[in-house]
Amino acid sequence: MRRLTDSFILGLAKGAVIPGLYPFRMTEGRSSLEQIGVVITVAISFLLTFKKFDPRFYKPIGDFKIVFLSLMAAKLPSFLSAVVMICLIFSEMRLRMILSRCVLIMPSYSPAVFTGMMVSLFFKSQMFDDYSVLTTTAFLLPFTLRYGWMIRSSGFLISLQKYRPILKSTSFREVDLKYLVKFTVEFLLLFTILWIGKIFLSMPKSNHLFFLTVVNNVFFKLNVFKAAACAMVAILSGLMMNVCLYRIIFEAFLGLGFSSIMLTLSSDLKDRSFYAGDLLNGFFCLVVCCMYFGV
């Protein structure tokens, strides 16, 4: 029962933290230079998550406070708001990195994690925009309070011994280069189709919560190339008939393609000596950046 509860708590927190969501919203109507500045900030904060880190000594209360105060201050004048958003993105990236590692390191139930994420994502819909500060902090609070007990569990400490930081010199020697090339090609294919869809389907400004839910699917996998082909058919159909249904179909198949890659990475690399959680976190952040930037 405790494992089930902890898994649900991790899912709530993962769904509440979408790195870059609020900073990318700030780029609407801004100059190209300002947009480039946001992307650079996101990239730097992402790279900093790869530094040497021991989850046993992490205290999430610091990032929790920053996220809460940053969201509270989001309506400040533009310059101050930009400074606040920089602080927010750094904390979001770190929280997401911690959560990605914990989900893989700690014994957890994937369906419970997914259910928690769906609950959090539902409350990020536009009907709850006025309560975004309340809902985000409410879903992060259980993880913040529970983290200390989680990492002291025997299962966590035993599993932690298998892992080393991703930048260890011996980490990538254990991975077949052809294996990484295959995933890189699949990443690039889906990212290219995503940008094509954004250009030709006139995707509206929204939270894309349906897409994010499908991306985090843990129940079944679809061949990436089949998913890409179906997404292209949806784009062509949307060009001929401007119906929102095709945008939904496009996001569904594209999300299934991304989730298939993440599921394969999670299952194949989980027992390797480096943090598969770092790869999954980086992949998710790239997907968010590609989907939200410039929409």
UniProtKB/Swiss-Prot annotation:
Keywords: Host membrane, Membrane, Transmembrane, Transmembrane helix. It is a multi-pass membrane protein. The keyword Transmembrane helix applies. It is found in: Host membrane. Its main location: host cell. InterPro entries: Herpes_U26. The chain crosses the membrane at residues 33-53, 66-86, 103-123, 131-151, 183-203, 218-238, 243-263, 274-294. One of its GO terms (cellular component) is host cell membrane. Pfam families: Herpes_U26 (PF07402). Coiled coil: none annotated. This is Protein U26. It comes from Human herpesvirus 6B (strain Z29) (HHV-6 variant B). The lineage of its organism: Viruses, Duplodnaviria, Heunggongvirae, Peploviricota, Herviviricetes. The gene is U26.
